[in-house]
Swiss-Prot record:
GO biological process, one term: L-methionine salvage from methylthioadenosine
Biological classification of the source: Bacteria, Pseudomonadati, Pseudomonadota, Gammaproteobacteria, Methylococcales
Disulfides per UniProt: none
Site feature location: Transition state stabilizer: 162
Keyword Isomerase appears in the UniProt entry: yes
UniProt-recorded name of the protein: Methylthioribose-1-phosphate isomerase
Organism: Methylococcus capsulatus (strain ATCC 33009 / NCIMB 11132 / Bath)
GO-annotated molecular function: S-methyl-5-thioribose-1-phosphate isomerase activity
InterPro entries attached to this UniProt entry: IF-2B-related (IPR000649), IF-M1Pi (IPR005251), IF_2B-like_C (IPR042529), Initiation_fac_2B_a/b/d (IPR011559), M1Pi_N (IPR027363), NagB/RpiA_transferase-like (IPR037171)
Any Pfam family: IF-2B
Pathway entry: Amino-acid biosynthesis; L-methionine biosynthesis via salvage pathway; L-methionine from S-methyl-5-thio-alpha-D-ribose 1-phosphate: step 1/6
Amino acid sequence: MSDHSFSAVSAVQALKWSDGGLEVLDQRLLPGDVVYQIFDTAAGVAEAIASMRVRGAPAIGIAAAYGVVLGARAAYARDPAHWKRAVEDDIAVLARSRPTAVNLFWALERMREAMAAIEGDPVPALLAAARRIHEDDLAANLAMGELGAAILGGCKGVLTHCNTGALATGGYGTALGVIRSTWRRGALERVYATETRPWSQGARLTVWELGQDRIPATLLADSAAAWLMKSGAVQWVVVGADRIAANGDVANKIGTYSLAVLARHHGVKLMVVAPISTVDWATATGEDIVVEERDPRELLHPLFLGSDSVIGAWNPVFDVTPAALIDAIVTEAGVVTNPSPDTMATLRGKAR
């Protein structure tokens, strides 16, 4: 699929491959500035992931796949006989960029499998493998959009958290893809988006994406979610996932667990939307998921950063929502309602 085909689906693209390297839309600058930066090394792509220039579990995996291509290109040019050894080092660097998003490790393993069979110049075959990962994610997004829209039906309002659209994926979106598909069916009146502190992905990215598609949206403070639910304005909370355990527990952006608890109290349903690659079948429950914690300086006012300050900050960027609080998990392989070890095992059978 060409970049033109990707743009036909989404008004924005987080990632674009060019002969010079990987073009990354710097999401830290949105919505004020739309700036693409070109990265031509695997280490550069790893830094782009770690610094959150690119973010969202599927997009992280796609970026890492292209990072392997860049690493292989440089390694083969330096030493055609031993390039694979150097690329393994690049894969290790990419794997350390973000610990929670399982799509990262899934994509790197796909690229490692493609690399194993290559003799000679690795770039054509590895670039084809990276493009397949990118294209497959877009196809999965479109499929999930239709499956999720069929569940939402004639929904008056939905609440979403963080950013799960084209900026976070190969195009179109996971949770935001469901919202897009529901809107295009004429079956949704309004989207509510949390600001999603501390990086404000909802305030900066989600409402910007919705505005690009002319979908009516209302931004609210994270702390206003309970009051919104009590008002009856929303019937569903629709979110993405960075990792789903084999029992249906879900790791997602910090605040998702709070929304799940609030939704259950107010009779609002919770839908999780993620590609099947986000399910980590080797992780039994959410208790086994490593939750990333970022620099406290992302939260603290400069006044409290001095060496003599007694003020600290705790900055986990994900939390884990128990399967018991989730009404539906939507993947391109099928939908699981009321997820449990048994229903997730059935999904695994479909995905094979």
